[in-house]
């Protein structure tokens, strides 16, 4: 096992990365090694998909499958070895189909990269035996640590882009050009590139690709559900039977709401599903009563205390046996945990039956509401008033503080930072990092809330659109605005969001609570020199430096 993709990975003087029987996330060495086999097999499949495109053969099913299966290897997504083996076998089937179509066109495997010729084992044990040749750090003794770090930066960034591609696909947003670029990068990374400049360029290409994907996802969500609007959301429960929907998939939320009409079951969002409550479409369901809990890392306590059924529509899942709720949590799509019921289709009757059999909430809790819904359209509508207040000196600065949440004690930095920003500044937030401060009262500036919840992590697209609108209004570049980005990272979606911002030329971003363990000191120095990227220190010191600039 070798895995170094998330913020909680093991760090030692001897080297970084989880490399024992189990990773810090709970992923076993077996599952980790199988995921490496899957990734290499997918890189080979992408090579075949590229070759097919050269002959006018485009298979939209394969275009959808590769990023979806790649998504299964993200942090806290799929811990079920049998499911990973099934993805490998499906990838091989698709590859054989493409090879059969290309054979009459004289396209042979020996003309393609080595990954395209890789033959995965027929079963779990056979695939495990192949792990050394497919490990994500294969060839580590043949290249320096900077090359390996850049390979991993690109691989993990592309994982994040793959996740957003799958989220967009669920909303009927697919693009052949985006898929072709994804296959190109996926295939190239499978060749184990060893030159610094092409790898840096690849990282920027991934960032630009992801910007297009975020645009597709934004279009898919707003077409299906309308534009989010400022909305007050209840964050305390009400009496009644209940289902909790976590993850990111609003289509699953829609299906659950439809299938629970008239049942008396209340539906709650959790984690990154909170922004769904701001979409006009979901306001037609009175039994969507609010949001429960906070960010992913608290689920073992929060799910244990939730007296109903839980559905994980995407990341993040952690061991449900710790809180003894594995019999009432259900997984969907790419999510998996051994022994947990997985729902293959769109029938949620098993979830409904479980909710009806459970106690539900018995008591009324004091009402507590928070305001959400400041995504792209709402921000654009508010922009003229914001611009006027900037010109009048009523708003001095904009802070975007958000990203991933996590367990590390140092993440208290984000709460402290949010509390400490000047009263004449606006605080934008997105991702589950918002839970560090989104239940605090920040007041308003002339009727404009100081805390503006932009949405899910992918709604960084909305924040970028606001920055572009402000730069146009003030006739300056984005980097000349009184705008500071302070991001928290945990996994690969955050990595690709960062690559997107860097590829768009955004500078002087601060990230924390730690630097990714796969980035060497030399690579971090390059990122600081080229982009002004800095690590967080203390809220007081960082804020003083920002305001003095």
Swiss-Prot record:
Chemical reaction(s) catalysed: A + NH4(+) + H2O = hydroxylamine + AH2 + H(+)
Cofactor binding remark: Binds 1 [2Fe-2S] cluster. Binds 1 hybrid [4Fe-2O-2S] cluster.
Top-rank taxon, per record: Bacteria
Cysteine persulfide PTM sites in chain numbering: 404
Compartmental location: Cytoplasm
Annotated positions binding [2Fe-2S] cluster: 3, 6, 18, 25
InterPro entries, A to Z: HCP/CODH, Hydroxylam_reduct, Prismane-like_a/b-sand, Prismane-like_sf, Prismane_a-bundle
EC number of this enzyme: 1.7.99.1
Ribonucleoprotein as UniProt keyword: no
SUPFAM superfamilies cross-referenced by the UniProt entry: Prismane protein-like (SSF56821)
Binding annotation for hybrid [4Fe-2O-2S] cluster: 248, 272, 316, 404, 432, 457, 491, 493
MF terms (GO), sorted A to Z: 2 iron, 2 sulfur cluster binding; hydroxylamine reductase activity; metal ion binding; peroxidase activity
Sorted UniProt keywords: 2Fe-2S, Cytoplasm, Iron, Iron-sulfur, Metal-binding, Oxidoreductase
Any one Pfam family match given in the protein's UniProt record, by short name: Prismane
GO biological process, one term: response to hydrogen peroxide
Cellular component, GO annotation: cytoplasm
Class of enzymatic activity (EC top level): oxidoreductase
Co-factor(s): [2Fe-2S] cluster; hybrid [4Fe-2O-2S] cluster
Cystines in this chain: none
UniProt function note: Catalyzes the reduction of hydroxylamine to form NH(3) and H(2)O.
Xref: PANTHER family: HYDROXYLAMINE REDUCTASE
Similarity-based family: Belongs to the HCP family.
This protein's name: Hydroxylamine reductase
Organism: Aeromonas hydrophila subsp. hydrophila (strain ATCC 7966 / DSM 30187 / BCRC 13018 / CCUG 14551 / JCM 1027 / KCTC 2358 / NCIMB 9240 / NCTC 8049)
